[in-house]
UniProtKB/Swiss-Prot annotation:
InterPro entries to which the protein is assigned, alphabetical: Corona_NS4 (IPR005603)
Sections of the chain in a coiled coil: none
Family stated for the protein in its record: Belongs to the coronaviruses ns4/ns4.8 protein family.
Superkingdom, natural source: Viruses
UniProt-recorded name of the protein: Non-structural protein of 4.8 kDa
């Protein structure tokens, strides 16, 4: 059990930064896409 919990904690600490970085990266990419499309639509008018 101690070994399993240690591995679980290690996996959790390793996975969390990766998921956070992926979420931030996707959020920034989506934000850039929406801002650029909104800018082009706004410039058309």
């Amino acid at each position: 059990m101690p070994m399993a919990t240690t591995i679980e904690v290690a996996d959790y600490t390793n996975i969390m930064p990766i998921t956070v970085s992926i979420t931030v990266y996707l959020g920034v990419s989506i934000g850039i896409d929406t801002s650029t499309t909104g800018f082009t639509c706004f410039s058309r008018y």
